[in-house]
Amino acid sequence: MATSFLFSLILLLITALSLPFPLHASSVDPFSVGATAVRYWNRKIPNNAPHPDFFLSLLSPLTASVSSSLSSPLSISPSICRSARLLCPNSTYFQSLSSTVFIDGCTLSYTYTFTYEHTNITVKPGIFFREQELKEGNVVRMPDIANELTTARSSFLPRSIADRIPFEAEAVKSLFGLEPNTTLAKAVDETVEQCQSSPSKGETKRCVTSAEDMIDFAVAMLGDDIVVRSTVLPNGPGESIMIGMVKGINGGKITSSVSCHEYLFPYMVYYCHSVPKIRVYEAEILSVQTKEKINSGVAICHIDTSAWNAGHPAFVALGGKPGQNEVCHWIFNGSMTWVIADKS
């Protein structure tokens, strides 16, 4: 009897497999949108460098079939917003989001023409520092690198969709149904304004809305033998830490990099910019009490600040004037920097 049942089950499976699949299976892309972005990376950056988790976590979770269904007409429903890991205006996060996260609380500006308009705003300790502080054994203040943007991180849209959305504040707010004067609507206004502002002298910048866009910009600026680095773990925020072993990327030589910083937006937007005359460092971050490693930090030092605004918060924190001293800062959790791969 068991043999008869097994034979019937096998026959049923064979019959089922011989039937046509629903939804035209031959036209269904078996790969996800994220996998497509990884293959794009491999074509553009053929050096077999690993794909770090912090980058992979940004890729769209949508399947190719769902992505295709969004192509025409383009609309973002609440269910798509959730499945695509976008920041929906009706989410509980945005009901409690502080307006200071992006609009008023940006203590680390990535636009070098940025200046404070209010003299009573102070810069948190450790946001900016001098290059000489990156020495093994030094105890320094580590700024808060685990911000609310990281908590509410969205994903990139598939490039085919992102490219169809006009990068205009009103168009984005209309597509996502953002009410005027809400925190997210204000963030959209601010992000678009920052992205459309003129670059500083010697700076090349682009706001990217897809993983492929970011890869294209990094390759255009640095070539195709590159790697991407970041301070991955949000350990050591807002407290004193000890600097462990320090390594200068590319031998500590003055070089160029492409740094990308996330902006608050319904879908992932990164402000990427290439600035000459910088040094990039990797440093072990140790506990002052136990001397144990709690993180690996990436820091960038801008050697030439001559084109910066005299009111930039770096000069508020450290003193000095544009072009007078170098300015260093950590690549915060959620940001990343692309550099030429070490030859050693």
What name fits each language-model region?
Residues A2-M214, T231, K343:
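Intrinsic-disorder-preferring feature that marks N-terminal prepro/targeting segments
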